[in-house]
A protein has these predicted regions:
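Short, compositionally biased P/S/T/A/G/V-rich stretches that sit at domain boundaries
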Residues: 116-155, 162-166
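A broadly tuned, weak detector of single residues within folded domains
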Residues: 26, 51, 101, 152-153
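Generic short alpha-helical hydrophobic face used as a protein-protein interaction/packing hotspot
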Residues: 37, 62, 112-113, 163
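Generic hydrophobic secondary-structure signal
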Residues: 5, 34, 84, 102, ...
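C-terminal accessory segments
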Residues: 73-132
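Predominantly extracellular beta-rich ligand-binding scaffolds that present long acidic/polar faces
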Residues: 1-96
Length: 167
């Protein structure tokens, strides 16, 4: 019964001394993640309370001055700037037009447990910043041509969808 938390970007900006995402989990394995902090009061990723919590091949970085406590586990990149492809300087807050791919100088390139990059890209699925499912079409329009029908009659619905990815 292992809980796996893979390929995420977690941004902590609260004024607490620790950032708790999981409360006392059992058999939690966090890998290929990027943990970012902006508040100077935050200096560690919670690694307590579970049995066990293991971090592998994850990157930590603080946009302020503190040094983040090293992660347990193996292959971690502690206190390393992720050098994202395109986000505002020193402001990693999520925005749909930010590019969270790793830049060429990032230590997270090819540093994941599978030899791919750490973070939201290069996991088991192709991440989409818009939140659309990657392997399914997404709905862009729905038209009901007969919105009042007697019981047992057909309701005519036309759907328009777009493919999320093209081959």
């Amino acid at each position: 019964d292992t809980i796996i938390f893979n390929n995420n970007v977690i941004i902590g900006d609260q004024a607490f001394s620790a950032y708790v995402i999981f409360f006392a989990p059992n058999n939690l394995v966090c890998q290929n993640n990027i943990w970012l902090f902006t508040s100077n009061a935050m200096t560690q990723v919670d690694q307590n309370g579970g049995n066990p919590i293991i971090h592998n091949n994850s990157l930590t970085y603080h946009y302020g001055t503190p040094t983040i406590t090293a992660l347990n586990g193996t292959g971690n990149l502690d206190n390393q700037n992720p050098f994202f492809a395109n986000i505002p300087a020193n402001n990693p807050y999520w925005a749909a037009d930010n590019d969270y791919n790793l830049g060429a100088s990032s230590a997270g390139n090819d540093a994941g447990t599978d030899g791919n990059d750490v973070g939201i890209y290069n996991g088991y699925y192709d991440f989409d910043m818009r939140g659309y499912p990657t392997e399914l079409p997404y709905l862009t329009e729905m038209t009901i041509s007969n919105n009042m029908v007697p019981a047992g009659s057909n309701l005519n619905v036309n759907l328009k969808v777009n493919a999320n990815k093209t081959n």
